[in-house]
Amino acid sequence: MGWTASLDMGSEKMVMALASGEGSVCHLKGIKIMASQGIEHGVIKDKEKVRMCIRSLMSELMKDREIEVMNVALSGAVLRIVERRIVVPIQKKVVEQSDLFRAEQRCIDAYGGGQDEVVDILPVGYAIDRGEMIADPLDRSGRNLEVTYQVYLADYDYLADIQGLFEGSGIQEIEFYPAVRAYAEALDVERAERDFALVDLGAMGVNVVLFRDGMLEYEAHLPIGVRTIDTDTMAAFALSFG
């Protein structure tokens, strides 16, 4: 049985979850939350303070367990999002999973080298032979498959700094992911019967995501969060009743 942990470093709260896994099944074993230090607007400003927070969470949650994978959520403030269209020939006249894999790999390879590293890619639409956009291309016939991806990039040095925070922890692998990936998997978007929007209220920002036909259609980050609303509300009451 392997152990997997996930870390979300917010501007006000830091959350770590621990799960055990057997095959494709995961069982949540515990969650710890503490006040964040060293993070402003979703960006690490003081690595030593962040390291201390992480060590505190790990000591309480993991104890003597050996963690195989640590999944780290990245805020929209450190991600660069670009759209990329990839065209690959359909090998066996009808679209198979292997065609999707080739398109995905070609998209990742397009960003090889440079200062940016690919954190994740999400398909947001498919088309066959330049036809109209569809949500599911599998078993469709044609010559060429066109996939439109939303690509999430992050600065290589910034990711290396985060990995350095876990140095000496014994964790075998550090994985990064954007918040939208967590939304999609937690809500099982592919099986959702209806289109829906999700609003994530953070301390320093608000994420708005729209899913349609089981796929990501729209994503936006608003740089005004709950802390700003609270501050403005308190200021208004002070002016009115002070």
What do the predicted segments below correspond to?
Residues 1-13, 17-196, 215-217, 240:
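Nucleotide/phosphate-binding catalytic cleft detector across ATP-hydrolyzing
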Residues 189-242:
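Acidic, glycine-rich loop-and-beta core segments that form the ion-binding/anion-interacting portion
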